């Protein structure tokens, strides 16, 4: 049983904590928070030992009636690996300032830059390259979504080139300081966007160009893909391959799943904690091949799709499982992923 800690119990951190707790080969030793907010209180109520990353704030936690087990440094000393879910840019500083000095393995999130971490990870793309490594970055929610569907397509028939238009949510549901509220924003306004190069950190030789927008919604990201194929296949071949791919779901618009809102309603009906959708949803009706080019649309739940990848990264880096398919299967079974 490997000892895991979560540095940053926020949107991703709390989900990774629950995912790790669901496994039978790893356990959560503790989680960290900076402020005595509702998430800190919920962490304790959910049975996690809480460690504070700013020791000087211990009195504010005491005043709020939130039990503190110790400091973040004390937590890190107890771990085999830490999953860093701190805000963008903080993880890289933690790597250099703390983890490397302690000799502690660490997993980072997609907000960190690939060059600062040195290695990126996706369960379906480069699991074997991360086995036994000390530091790795789980690629972003958008990149994870692209890799989930492009990998099986590449395995089936090869890919010459990918062009993707990313329609990104403006903010997470709980965020009130981001937007837009009443605009469509090219983000970035330059082409290509950073998503293509991010995919190439795990699918090394893929020819991909991306462009991205921000829109006033909070539910999900939506991708529109155009994929030039190397070999001739039918739409039915693509459907069959995606159907058998873990963490990918074919959505039927004809059954009422006509939007990201419908997809999230489906998550509620599944009884998922926090309405999470770890799977990437591909609209079956959007699948089409014209002159050797595959077209399809997909939806990504930005708050949760990277969570199972964090669990797989733990197994790879701690050399708990050398077969990616076995880790994926084990993670999925424990988390109830379709």
Swiss-Prot record:
Q: Which Gene3D superfamilies match?
A: Dihydrodipicolinate Reductase, domain 2, NAD(P)-binding Rossmann-like Domain
Subunit structure, interactors included: Homotetramer.
Record: active site: 141 (nucleophile)
Instruction: State which Enzyme Commission number(s) the record gives.
Output: 1.2.1.59
Q: Identify the gene encoding this protein.
A: gap
Annotated GO biological processes are: glycolytic process; lysine biosynthetic process via diaminopimelate
The organism encoding this protein is Methanobacterium bryantii
Q: Which residues bind NAD(+)?
A: 11-12, 111, 169, 302
Binding locations of D-glyceraldehyde 3-phosphate: 140-142, 195-196
Q: Which family does it belong to?
A: Belongs to the glyceraldehyde-3-phosphate dehydrogenase family.
Q: Name one GO cellular component term.
A: cytoplasm
The record's section on HAMAP family has: G3P_dehdrog_arch
Pathway of action: Carbohydrate degradation; glycolysis; pyruvate from D-glyceraldehyde 3-phosphate: step 1/5
Q: Which UniProt keywords apply?
A: Cytoplasm, Glycolysis, NAD, NADP, Oxidoreductase
Kindly state which reaction or reactions the protein catalyses: D-glyceraldehyde 3-phosphate + phosphate + NADP(+) = (2R)-3-phospho-glyceroyl phosphate + NADPH + H(+); D-glyceraldehyde 3-phosphate + phosphate + NAD(+) = (2R)-3-phospho-glyceroyl phosphate + NADH + H(+)
Q: Where is the signal peptide?
A: none
Q: Name one GO molecular function term.
A: NAD binding
Q: Which Pfam families match?
A: DapB_N, Gp_dh_C
EC class? oxidoreductase
Q: Provide the protein's localization.
A: Cytoplasm
Q: What is this protein called?
A: Glyceraldehyde-3-phosphate dehydrogenase
